[in-house]
């Protein structure tokens, strides 16, 4: 998932409210686990591709969201393939055997990762960080009754989302500077690699603390006193488009249950 980046657009998902998109993403998670056979996975795969295509986002951004968990997907695939020993033997070479159930589970688990990361990436790329945090604050509003500091939580999320791309860019600059000095972060034993990371972390932490201090000073100078009396440039309103998005999710769930053999 790509966090802190927003690509403006005019697609259906772009024009839906952030509240509806967050509800859609959270409710999509349990639906993924309904896909346990070929029919449900083919349908969910087609739905995910349709969502990606209709968002009109450059495919490189979606692939960028998948890249951080690519190792996890491959690792999970191999683990399921090697340690699930049920069903007919599909391939055998000495001690190495691939079982039918192992291959089935490996494909299903890998696809689940793909579905989840693709949809959450779509939500974050089609929603600006400020809209995302305002929506979270709105969804947390009922918890104000039990004195949960919803505005402060939303503010922390907003600042985190704002500075994650900045810190990532800063990390890349420091890495290039270290490599220019002859530091190789990808070679040698693990102990040496960890030792090579220390010169990378220290300037990164110093930069992060300096940015935090500058931000706190700027907020104080502008008279920030919490969420009391705060107004917003754009108020989030529930529209028929948002209702359509949730109804689409309900239809998806019912169809998955049917294809799974639940009716």
Curated annotation (Swiss-Prot):
Q: Which UniProt keywords apply?
A: Cell membrane, Membrane, Transmembrane, Transmembrane helix, Transport
Localization terms from the record? Cell membrane
Query: How is the protein disposed in the membrane?
Result: Multi-pass membrane protein
InterPro entries recorded: ABC/ECF_trnsptr_transmembrane, EcfT
Which N-terminal stretch is annotated as signal sequence?
none
Please, which domain of life does this record's source organism belong to? Bacteria
| Pfam families for this protein | CbiQ (PF02361)
Please classify the protein's predominant subcellular localization into one broad category.
Answer: membrane
- Locate the transmembrane regions by residue number: 22-42, 69-89, 105-125, 243-263
A Gene Ontology term for the protein's cellular component: plasma membrane
Q: Which GO terms describe its molecular function?
A: transmembrane transporter activity
Which HAMAP family does the UniProt entry name for this protein? Answer: EcfT
Q: Summarize subunit and interaction data from the UniProt record for this chain.
A: Forms a stable energy-coupling factor (ECF) transporter complex composed of 2 membrane-embedded substrate-binding proteins (S component), 2 ATP-binding proteins (A component) and 2 transmembrane proteins (T component). May be able to interact with more than 1 S component at a time.
Q: Which family does it belong to?
A: Belongs to the energy-coupling factor EcfT family.
Q: What does this protein do?
A: Transmembrane (T) component of an energy-coupling factor (ECF) ABC-transporter complex. Unlike classic ABC transporters this ECF transporter provides the energy necessary to transport a number of different substrates.
- Protein known as: Energy-coupling factor transporter transmembrane protein EcfT
- Its gene name is ecfT
């Amino acid at each position: 998932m790509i966090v802190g980046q927003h690509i403006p657009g005019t697609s259906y998902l772009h024009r839906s409210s952030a509240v509806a998109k967050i509800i859609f993403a959270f409710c999509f998670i349990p639906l993924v686990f309904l896909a346990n056979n070929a029919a449900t996975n083919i349908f969910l795969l087609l739905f995910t591709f349709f969502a990606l295509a209709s968002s009109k986002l450059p495919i490189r951004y979606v692939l960028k969201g998948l890249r951080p968990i690519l190792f996890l997907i491959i690792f999970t695939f191999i683990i399921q393939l090697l340690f699930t020993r049920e069903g007919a033997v599909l391939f055998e070479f000495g001690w190495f055997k691939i079982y039918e159930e192992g291959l089935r589970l490996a494909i299903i688990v890998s696809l689940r990762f793909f579905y989840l990361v693709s949809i959450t990436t779509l939500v974050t790329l089609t929603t600006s960080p400020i809209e995302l945090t305002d929506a979270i604050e709105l969804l947390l509003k009922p918890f104000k009754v039990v004195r949960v500091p919803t505005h402060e939580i939303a503010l922390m999320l907003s600042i985190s989302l704002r500075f994650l791309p900045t810190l990532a860019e800063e990390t890349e600059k420091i890495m290039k500077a270290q490599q220019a000095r002859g530091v190789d972060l990808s070679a040698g034993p693990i102990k040496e690699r960890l030792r090579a990371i220390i010169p990378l972390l220290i300037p990164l932490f110093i930069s992060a603390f300096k940015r935090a201090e500058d931000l706190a000073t700027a907020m104080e100078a502008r008279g920030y006193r919490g969420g009391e009396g705060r107004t917003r440039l754009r108020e989030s309103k529930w529209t028929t488009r948002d209702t359509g998005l949730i109804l689409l999710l309900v239809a998806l769930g019912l169809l998955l249950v049917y294809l799974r053999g639940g009716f």
